[in-house]
Amino acid sequence: AREADSRWIGELWQNYLNTVAANRQIPAQQVFPGAQGLLEGLTKTGGDTAKYALENKLVDALASSAEIEKALTKEFGWSKTDKNYRAISYYDYALKTPADTGDSIGVVFANGAIMDGEETQGNVGGDTTAAQIRDARLDPKVKAIVLRVNSPGGSVTASEVIRAELAAARAAGKPVVVSMGGMAASGGYWISTPANYIVANPSTLTGSIGIFGVITTVENSLDSIGVHTDGVSTSPLADVSITRALPPEAQQMMQLSIENGYKRFITLVADARHSTPEQIDKIAQGHVWTGQDAKANGLVDSLGDFDDAVAKAAELAKVKQWHLEYYVDEPTFFDKVMDNMSGSVRAMLPDAFQAMLPAPLASVASTVKSESDKLAAFNDP
C-alpha cells in the first residue's frame, strides 16, 4: 500500500511541477530544485522567500496591497459607490449563455460521497441523482448526457441505483459521457461504467476498484472500564450489537457479500472496457490510479476537462448547436435565501460561522465534521 501511495502521490507532484513550469515558462527543476537546492537559494537571498520567488520567476513582481490597489485603480478606475477599484467578485461573475432553445446536453453532477436515498449537502444521493438522470433521459430535447463525477465512492447500493439509470439512458439511445473531476474512485468509478466515453484530468484520482465493509464494535473499550453486556437470543444473528464482538457467522456472511460485490464490480468494469474480469482484477484490488495511469490501463478514454467531455457528447449525439441543461435539485427555502446574497458573501459564511467559536472549539469542530462526514458515507444496507 505504501508503494502504491508513493506512486500516485509522486505522479500528482510531477504533474503539478510540469503545470507550473509550463505556465511560468521555466524548467520544472526551477519550480522546485529539491530541499537542498531550495536551501541554497534561500541562503543566497538571506532567507527572503519573496526575493527568492522573484529571482526564480515564480512571480512577476513584488508589491504591497496598497500598491496593487493603486495599479488596478489606474487600469480600471475607481468606484465611489463601492469605494474600491471597479471589479466584480469571481463568485458573482456570470458567463453569457446562449438562449435555452433547441437541442440540449444534459449535465448531472455527482459531487461528494455516494449515499443511499435523497441528496444531502456535500453528498450524492443515489435516488436523487438517478431521478435527475431519468429526467434527462425522458426529455426529448436532451440529446446526450454528461455526468460530472467528483466522488471518492460510498454506498454500493446507491452506486448501483445511479449506474442502472445511466445504463438505461444509454440503452435509450442517448450518448453518455463521464467527466471526471479531482476524484472518481471506487463507487465514483462504478457509476461511470455505463458511459460511452470517459474523460479524466491527468491528475484525477480514479480506480480504487474494490469493496470493503465496516461495522464498529466497542466491546474492548467497554471492557477496559469494567462494563460488560449479556443476554439471550434465538440466534447469534438475532442480537447483533456494537457492545459485543460480531458473531463469526455474521463475519463470514459479510465477507461473502463483499467478495460477491467485488466480483460484480470487476465484471461491470470488464464489460464496459471490453476486457475480462481477470485482466481488470490485475489493476483493481483497490489500487488508486492517476488519470494518466488510468488512460494507460484502459480505464478512461482520454485526458481532458469538462469542456472536452461536452464536446465529445455533442459529437456522439451528432448535434451542431446546443445548450447545456443542468439537472439540480429544487432549491430549499434556505437555498433561496442564500441565492439572494452576493456570491462573495456566501463564500465567506463558513469562515464567519467558525469565527464565532473560540479558537480551540473551532479547530475541534472542523475535525469532528470531517470525521463524521466519512462515517456518514457508510450507510449501505
Where do the protein language model's features map onto the residues?
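Long hydrophobic segments that form regular secondary structure
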Residues: 137-142, 263-277, 287, 291-295
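Gly/Pro- and small hydrophobic-enriched strand-loop and loop-to-helix capping segments
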Residues: 59-69, 195-210, 300-310
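Catalytic-center loop of serine/cysteine hydrolases
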Residues: 1-23, 172, 185, 195-272, ...
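Cleft-lining beta-strand/loop regions that shape enzyme active-site pockets
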Residues: 20, 97-221
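Active-site-proximal glycine-rich helix-loop-beta segment
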Residues: 49-58, 188-197, 297-299
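Hydrophobic, secondary-structure "cap" segments at the distal end of domains
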Residues: 24-32, 269-280
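Intrinsically disordered, low-complexity segments enriched in small/flexible residues
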Residues: 1-50, 54-137, 141-144, 233-234, ...
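Terminal peptide-recognition signature
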Residues: 5, 53, 108, 147, ...
